[in-house]
Amino acid sequence: MIIVTGGAGFIGSNIVKALNDKGITDILVVDNLKDGTKFVNLVDLNIADYMDKEDFLIQIMAGEEFGEIEAIFHEGACSSTTEWDGKYMMDNNYQYSKELLHYCLEREIPFLYASSAATYGGRTSDFIESREYEQPLNVYGYSKFLFDEYVRQILPEANSQIVGFRYFNVYGPREGHKGSMASVAFHLNTQLNNGESPKLFEGSDGFKRDFVYVGDVADVNLWFWENGVSGIFNLGTGRAESFQAVADATLAYHKKGSIEYIPFPDKLKGRYQAFTQADLTNLRKAGYDKPFKTVAEGVTEYMAWLNRDA
């Protein structure tokens, strides 16, 4: 069996889909479905079982067995960069991850987990997986950074696979439940379909991020599991592209609309990453050599998925 925590969420459900595409359906999805809308992410997928996150954590902490586990993909976390309840964030993203990590180490189960580019904070260059480049801007980034630091202490002695992925700006199918935290591409598409002008912040041709398609993210996860490589790796495309490029690809797909530029909100000043670009040196050195979709390629594929019933 394979366990995917956060399996009803955005990246988790895409990992479940990637496993299904390989004929793997003996999957336990762990999640919190208090937000019942997330069920739609699993409707077209095949899994063996579902368990609530709290029940799962109780069983993990009690050392209970789940049969033969081939791997745990740990995508379950609070991923809101605007959540400032530090206790909630540390319980969810740090303590929970530590419990799972030790459970896996004791049983030599491969443990693949979600880290984040938020560990780098507000820097505009040198997004490199090393302590001197890491200075998170919010408690979410700090929770991810601290777990990476914890993993670094353990990696040299570990007898089983531990791999963390620092996700950059992930977008693509199955993120609709994320609301305001969903990608720009998702919001632009919704605005167009509602007959509104799609909106970007003023200066969006100058705001550049490493936008990575979720299908590529799932592919990297599975490749590392299949190849048993350990470490902490950036997971982006290695190419920064502008928010304007995302909008251009969205408008090109819809063949209509024009962008309305809105003032940059004061509350985001100083807390907004103006530029991100993954350094893929370590990822490539580890052996992953497949190309990543450009914004034009990924957004076009995503638009086709979002508008498949139109």
From Swiss-Prot:
Q: What is known of its domains?
A: Contains a large N-terminal NADP-binding domain, and a smaller C-terminal substrate-binding domain.
What protein family is recorded? Belongs to the NAD(P)-dependent epimerase/dehydratase family. HldD subfamily.
Q: Which UniProt keywords apply?
A: Carbohydrate metabolism, Isomerase, NADP
Identify the catalytic residues: 140, 178
Q: HAMAP family annotated for this entry?
A: Heptose_epimerase
Function of this protein?
Catalyzes the interconversion between ADP-D-glycero-beta-D-manno-heptose and ADP-L-glycero-beta-D-manno-heptose via an epimerization at carbon 6 of the heptose.
Functional pathway: Nucleotide-sugar biosynthesis; ADP-L-glycero-beta-D-manno-heptose biosynthesis; ADP-L-glycero-beta-D-manno-heptose from D-glycero-beta-D-manno-heptose 7-phosphate: step 4/4
Query: Which EC numbers characterise this protein's activity in its record?
Result: 5.1.3.20
Q: Which cofactor does it need?
A: NADP(+)
Catalytic activity line of the entry: ADP-D-glycero-beta-D-manno-heptose = ADP-L-glycero-beta-D-manno-heptose
How are cofactors bound according to the entry's free-text note?
Binds 1 NADP(+) per subunit.
The UniProt annotation places NADP(+) binding at 10-11, 31-32, 38, 53, 75-79, 92, 144, 170, 178
Molecular function in Gene Ontology: ADP-glyceromanno-heptose 6-epimerase activity; NADP binding
Q: What is this protein called?
A: ADP-L-glycero-D-manno-heptose-6-epimerase
Annotated residues that bind substrate are located at 169, 180, 187, 201-204, 209, 272
A Pfam family recorded for this sequence: Epimerase
List the Gene3D superfamilies. Answer: NAD(P)-binding Rossmann-like Domain (3.40.50.720), UDP-galactose 4-epimerase, domain 1 (3.90.25.10)
Q: Does the keyword GTP-binding apply?
A: no
Q: Which GO terms describe its biological process?
A: ADP-L-glycero-beta-D-manno-heptose biosynthetic process; carbohydrate metabolic process
Subunit structure, per the record?
A: Homopentamer.
Enzyme class, spelled out: isomerase
